[in-house]
UniProtKB/Swiss-Prot annotation:
GO BP term (any one): sporulation resulting in formation of a cellular spore
Disulfide cross-links: none
Chain spans, region Disordered: 318-340
Keyword Transport: no
Functional note: Promotes colloidosmotic lysis by binding to the midgut epithelial cells of lepidopteran larvae.
Keywords: Plasmid, Sporulation, Toxin, Virulence
Protein species of origin: Bacillus thuringiensis subsp. thompsoni
Gene name of this polypeptide: cry15Aa
Gene Ontology MF terms in the entry: toxin activity
Protein name from the UniProt record: Pesticidal crystal protein Cry15Aa
Length: 340
């Protein structure tokens, strides 16, 4: 549940705490007055800008590419999709004053995307109403325009699937402002910055008009600290961001009906949401399987691709050396496939 300070109530409470011990029993303070204080130095500062996010699949769409000729073709898998992203802001510890206090902020957050172990930078733009605990949600649309060349073998069909992954993260935010008192209200000391005053009967000195300055607010709540002249109030907010992180195109290759051939799956390079960064398939990490990596140095032909054959019986009958696939790697992929 949100916490809310009220400067007027806190000023009255601080005055009671300070003057209370000196009030003659049986009497009640009179002529209570809240002076025209000022608010300034309104600041918003993120508490953390580095996040680790586990991505989740947000959207996928597929298209088929056909090659019914006897020669390999280069075709293009093209996608143009848009996804809605949200930024929700909630004040968790706010303050009420005589005026509306709000501030806008823009900052860059760095997000470590787990599974691909890459960091992207995103700009978060928000606005905070210090006196409202209502969650404010803004939406934007991000476009994903992908055009990837794909080699389609003879008499084959290739299914290209665009997969868009998103992630959520929450930015803790620190809010602060200063409370300035009104000067010229205290007789004999016109420079005293009065915030609140009341008249009471002092047990020893009789009738007294007692003024307090903004720094006294710390007596009412630990949300305030004193700098000797003003009170500095500190609060909190949260900003929850849900946005696209990266996209990847999965390629499923299979022979057309009535033709023999290999069936395989592989991934095209990843596109991060800050689109200037393109990742090669080998950087996807263990969470997204790469079906056609480059063999290690123990293979007979170092630059030969490893192909996973989904037809397991044909796969077992093949001569791995002739296909340029290492025995140990072929056995490993066979075991991995059996587990699926």
């Amino acid at each position: 549940m949100a916490i809310m300070n009220d400067i007027a109530q806190d000023a009255a409470r601080a005055w009671d705490i300070i003057a209370g011990p000196f009030i003659r029993p049986g009497t009640t303070p009179t002529n209570r007055q809240l002076f025209n204080y000022q608010i300034g130095n309104i600041e918003v500062e993120p508490g953390n800008l580095n996040f680790s996010v586990v991505p989740e699949l947000d959207f996928s769409v597929s298209q088929d590419l056909f090659n019914n000729t006897s020669v390999q073709q280069s075709q293009t898998a093209s996608f143009n999709e848009s996804r809605t992203e949200t930024t929700s802001t909630a004040v968790t510890h706010g303050v009420k004053s005589g005026v509306t206090v709000s501030a806008s902020a823009k900052f860059n957050a760095k997000i470590l995307v787990k599974s691909i172990e890459q960091t992207i930078t995103t700009t978060v733009s928000t606005e905070y109403n210090f006196s409202s605990t209502t969650t404010r949600t803004n939406t934007v649309t991000r476009g994903w325009s992908i055009a990837q060349p794909v080699l389609v073998p003879p008499h084959s069909r290739v299914t290209a699937t665009l997969q868009i992954y998103k992630g959520d993260f929450t930015v803790p935010v620190l809010l602060s402002l200063r409370v300035y008192g009104q000067t010229g209200t205290l007789a004999g000391n016109p420079s005293f910055p009065s915030l609140y005053a009341a008249t009471y009967e002092n047990t020893l000195l009789g009738r007294i008009r007692e003024h307090i300055a903004p720094p006294a607010l710390f007596r009412a709540s630990n949300a305030y600290i004193s700098n000797g002249v003003q009170a500095i109030w500190r609060g909190t907010a949260t900003t929850r961001v849900s946005q696209g992180l990266y996209s990847v195109v999965r390629i499923d290759e299979r022979p057309l009906a009535g033709y023999s051939g290999e069936t395989r799956t592989y991934y095209l390079p990843v596109t991060l949401s800050n689109s200037s960064q393109i990742l090669t398939p080998g950087s996807l990490g263990s969470e997204i399987p790469i079906i056609n990596p480059v063999p290690n140095a123990s293979c007979k032909k170092e630059n030969s691709p490893i192909i996973i054959h989904h037809d397991r019986e044909k796969h077992r009958e093949r001569d791995y050396d002739k296909e340029h696939i290492c025995h140990d790697q072929a056995e490993k992929y066979e075991r991995d496939y059996d587990k699926e």
